[in-house]
């Protein structure tokens, strides 16, 4: 196993160990045991920077099911390294922050188990080369995030937010699964790199458009893009460390990673360019507009996150244009990839810090309601400093890193509007307009975020707690991120050669070696647009109290949340009615539906899939076998038309004993003896229960009732026979029976093959089966004891009365 595999598996292993440590070390905060895990992974990833800088990649394989083309393949290039550093680096700071945020009285064992589970899943997503493995980790991120969001499960809002996120992201996961299967059909491979190398085969496939749509749905749901963004604001009910980790730096960026990774395959389609770009721009505008009217600090950051993700998504869409040009022209549009990567890093720094500061304010005052907050400037000066740095970066104000990436974003929108491709040169003028409008609202909510908390009147009577500055443990992580905001803004070259260029080359597959970011490029359209953004933003802030009321009056029916909630109520009701229409309290009717569907499915498959039945090696049928089969069929037929319960029991036993005799003729005395014992016990139990069984009513005597039973029984029997013959005649693997014949005596020192298989080769299976029987027996015994106890208590009450 390689170090890369260990890096992915390490958090998963610790996720199993941490709950055990929690039981024995309750005096020490569990976070201190968790903190080394992401730090070690982060340090290991740092050692791989030189590898990706030189244009090399790391490919490691761990065999799993090689015959089916499914191995635990990990592939690390510049893009995978970037995300791995974010996952482990931000993860380290989040764990450190959580030590101060969560008290020892919380269920820390569960929390850190879920957090490490998510960390390992995210690393698996960004490093997997096998799309099936990627999908498994993808769904694991949804599952673990569900557990983290619902961590405070006593809150109804937490349960609601967790369910909504799970439903939407799992829907996207199923779409992703469909997409990757359609990708694998033309290439006959599950390797992402192989698919990229054979992208032309996929593009010529009839499944290309369908695969592209399904992949985009999977990415859009994960990254909370329009119209799937509604799950993210409700996910803010999670503890603040979860929000800072999942919803700013990791999970919500999994969709961006997927779009970036799949761009070499789908960039040839104008549908990909237009859809990814427009969805990103619409998300940017809509979410930034909604962020301005939020009354909860986390609500502001939630919609802010959605808008910033939309900005990055739009840049990835614009960058796809580079695949349609060569040379320097290609590099012009590939600059959008560079801007997307840079802003992805910047967003993780300032948004992670802002989430942590929000948690600090909530921890200090007991509320996140902007109507109750204000005037905390002198009470929380350190938090104020960190907030100003990171919020101004989010607003795109120099000299912070957010200004550089925002300028790059505006430049890419102007550049894209000039592309003579896919009608972008005519309709592309919308790109900079939407980008500027979205940036104006981004500026507004960023400045208002600072003002809501630290300026205005201090209202101690409305605060659940007396406000105070939080501990150093809660300030250290956001302070580190705020420092990075300044450093990356003043010295972006630290990132360009080591991180941004290799990551961009992984998407564009061309050598990107001239990436530069500057605070001032001259009087460019992007710079002039920035001045317009500042002016309009200040005007909107001054008039904020007037126009924000119009936004807050938005009718509920015009929101996607309204339709989600309505669907969540209507669909279960219709499902219940539909289920009740065919599922009854009469088990016979339920079995008719189940077996009828099985028969229909079997025969549809038989007539639609080519097969052959081979009778070459079938043993000859002897006369006494025919006699036993006739006896067996006669008994089974009589059961269907029996008029008494006793006669049915006798005939059913006759069928079982006839099968036992067949086993004897087939030289399987052990099976025959077992069948004989089972039938004897079953018959005895039936006779013991005979007194309590209801009589066969007139409904059972109806001819239609009996004919239906006969058809279903015969159909199931025929289906099993046909499936058995087809399986016998269409063997794709060598029979395992030869292995048992050769090794039964050598390995197990037994001559009875059946006994040896059951006791030795499949001993654990037999043990568990016996355990299940034992548990079932204990359950029946317990139920009988409880019934007797209740009867005794009832008699005592009657005697007392």
Swiss-Prot record:
Bridged cysteine pairs (disulfide): none
Gene Ontology terms: biological process: proton transmembrane transport; sodium ion transport
GO function term, MF aspect, one: antiporter activity
Keywords, sorted A to Z: Antiport, Cell membrane, Hydrogen ion transport, Ion transport, Membrane, Sodium, Sodium transport, Transmembrane, Transmembrane helix, Transport
Main location: membrane
Membrane topology: Multi-pass membrane protein
Subcellular location(s) of the protein: Cell membrane
InterPro entries: CPA3_Na-H_Antiporter_A, MrpA/MnhA1/PhaAB, MrpA_C/MbhD, MrpA_C/MbhE, ND/Mrp_TM, Proton_antipo_N
Membrane-spanning ranges: 4-25, 30-49, 79-101, 108-127, 131-153, 166-188, 208-230, 243-265, 270-289, 302-324, 339-361, 373-395, 429-451, 472-494, 526-548, 589-611, 621-641, 646-668, 672-694, 707-729, 767-784
GO CC aspect terms: plasma membrane
Residue stretches in coiled coil: none
Known regulation of activity: Na(+) extrusion is completely inhibited by the H(+) conductor carbonyl cyanide m-chlorophenylhydrazone (CCCP).
Family of this protein: Belongs to the CPA3 antiporters (TC 2.A.63) subunit A family.
Subunit structure of this chain's protein: May form a heterooligomeric complex that consists of seven subunits: mnhA1, mnhB1, mnhC1, mnhD1, mnhE1, mnhF1 and mnhG1.
Function as written in the Swiss-Prot or TrEMBL entry: Mnh complex is a Na(+)/H(+) antiporter involved in Na(+) excretion.
Name recorded for this polypeptide: Na(+)/H(+) antiporter subunit A1
Lineage, top ranks: Bacteria, Bacillati, Bacillota, Bacilli, Bacillales
